[in-house]
Amino acid sequence: MRIVRSLLAVAIGSIVILVFYDAFLQFLTQPYRNICSVNPEFKCDGTLFALGPIEGLSARMRIAGYGGLIFAIPVIMWQLWKFLVPALNKQEKKYSIPFIITSVVLFLAGGSLAYWTLDKALEFLITWSGAGVEQTYQISKYISLVAMMVLAFGVGFLVPVLIVFLQLVGVITPQTLIRQWRYSLMGTFLLSAGITPSGDPVSMLALAVPMSMLFFVAVLIGFIAQRKKAKRNPEGE
């Protein structure tokens, strides 16, 4: 039933995207048009092209699908948390609302950062494609790149939430995380490089740096939660 609710939320989000498709398409292609307009040496006019009569429809459905998934993230996170709740104790269950709100806010923050980074990433990629190379982008591939960037950044920003959760349920301690912080940061940069679809250093750093900062915030929250738990149960020290 939880899967059905999540799929229904995706479907509703997709319908909303289809109704306002032109506005969303303009929004998604704005970064590409921006770099073309301010960099005439890039030899592009901001126009996307379709290879065949079906590709335009395919791009429309991709935008609807990806957009529906992004819009449904709050519902999906809530359903996932409700699935985990039975395995939690009473003390852990009280974190439900803060976890959901934080997860949604961080996902949206990550997605927004991806969109803001997109023109910088495209500028880097176009520059490194070489002088005199005319830039003409296929609409379906461009839309997939934008969508995967947003999803990658959004999911990347959720990793600290997972770290906090694992500390609260006792799977890992903040002391262990802080001792291994160098490996954690290395893992953060490797993860950023792995999930960034464009593969450019601009996007990788734009994701890795805030993820690293959020890692330390997550560890700090773990220490605070550990101290509060020790005060509630002094005999457990």
Predicted regions and their residues:
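Membrane topogenic/interface segments and analogous intrinsically disordered interaction regions
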Residues: 1-237
